[in-house]
């Protein structure tokens, strides 16, 4: 693959030279990327920028690049789920490391710094609403990384085996994987965040132990997650993207991690729908930390 042009069927480039889903050009992308699920939140981030050079949207993918405290930053929405992360991470890496004219990898690798800001449900009774949880480790229930050949080279196999035993993991489920976030980002953010081991679920309801009208395969999911502890880590929260983000970044040679605002506590069954002021504070603090 490294010596042959990537076929157009595998990497689709639009007529205007932009990458297929994100619809942005290689020159549109900054080295520092702040990602979030909600396209509308990108506009809120942009209000904090000093300057704005571009604003593009395609489907759920909203991109604004500008400057913050003298540094170029891209704010980008990824939509919901690890399947979207597979698209976004592949296309971000292509923008950074594939020559769109020759369709060959560039001689010099460009390393991106990617922070995802999201919301989550806390999985421990002692984590209060409003906490900022940094995913040191992510647990993928989604199976996305199992489709990439080198995935096992980054998996934390001791964690995985202990977790499968503890959960009595159903054989019909995709095998869970554990992956560590960027040490560089962890070092920058660990002073003001909760040390997290985060579950990325392939859905919001059943896969996170929520039952509305359908019975669950694992009705005691939250209780089982609360009880898992390994090498000083416990399951802190549940969301839907961090595992694929951290894993694909490691495989592709980028730095990535997720910080989530806890807007619900699944154990004590509390939630805070009025979380937007806290989210704004998180976005501002994240920008300050990324650009420091």
Which residues does each predicted region cover?
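Active-site rim beta-loop-alpha module in soluble metabolic enzymes
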Residues: 158-230
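Intrinsically disordered, low-complexity segments enriched in small residues
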Residues: 21-26, 202-208, 280-288
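Metabolite-binding pocket within alpha/beta catalytic cores that recognizes anionic/polar moieties
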Residues: 2-177
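Generic structural signal for well-ordered, non-membrane alpha-helical segments
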Residues: 35, 39-42, 78-85, 89, ...
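Glycine-rich beta-alpha junction loops
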Residues: 121, 138, 199-206, 244, ...
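A short, acidic, amphipathic alpha-helical segment used as a generic capping/interface helix at domain edges
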Residues: 222-232, 238, 242-248
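Zn-dependent metallopeptidase/amidohydrolase metal-coordination segment
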Residues: 243-275
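His/Asp/Glu-rich mid-to-C-terminal helical/loop segments that flank catalytic regions of hydrolases
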Residues: 265-292
């Amino acid at each position: 693959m490294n010596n042959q042009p990537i076929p157009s069927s595998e990497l689709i480039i639009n007529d205007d030279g932009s990458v297929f889903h994100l619809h942005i050009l290689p020159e549109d992308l900054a080295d520092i990327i702040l990602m979030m699920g909600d396209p509308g939140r990108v506009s809120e981030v942009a209000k904090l920028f000093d300057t704005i050079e571009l604003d593009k949207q395609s489907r759920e993918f909203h991109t604004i690049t500008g400057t913050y405290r003298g540094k170029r930053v891209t704010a980008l929405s990824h939509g919901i789920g690890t399947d979207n992360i597979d698209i976004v991470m592949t296309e971000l890496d292509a923008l950074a490391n594939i020559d769109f004219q020759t369709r060959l990898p560039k001689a010099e690798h460009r390393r991106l710094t990617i922070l995802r800001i999201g919301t989550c449900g806390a999985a421990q009774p002692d984590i209060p609403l409003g906490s900022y949880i940094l995913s040191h480790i992510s647990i993928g229930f989604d199976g996305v990384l199992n489709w990439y050949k080198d995935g096992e080279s980054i998996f934390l196999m001791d964690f995985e085996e202990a977790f499968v035993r503890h959960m009595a993991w159903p054989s019909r489920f995709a095998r869970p994987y554990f992956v560590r976030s960027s040490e560089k980002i962890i070092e920058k953010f660990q002073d003001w965040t909760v040390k997290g081991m985060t579950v990325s679920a392939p859905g919001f309801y059943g896969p996170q132990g929520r039952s509305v009208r359908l019975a669950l395969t694992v009705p005691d999911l939250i209780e089982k997650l609360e009880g898992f502890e390994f090498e000083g880590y416990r399951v802190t929260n549940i969301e839907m993207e961090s595992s694929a983000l951290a894993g694909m970044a490691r495989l592709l040679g980028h730095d990535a991690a997720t910080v989530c605002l806890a807007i619900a506590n699944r154990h004590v069954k509390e939630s805070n729908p009025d979380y937007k002021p806290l989210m704004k504070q998180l976005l501002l603090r994240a920008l300050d930390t990324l650009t420091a």
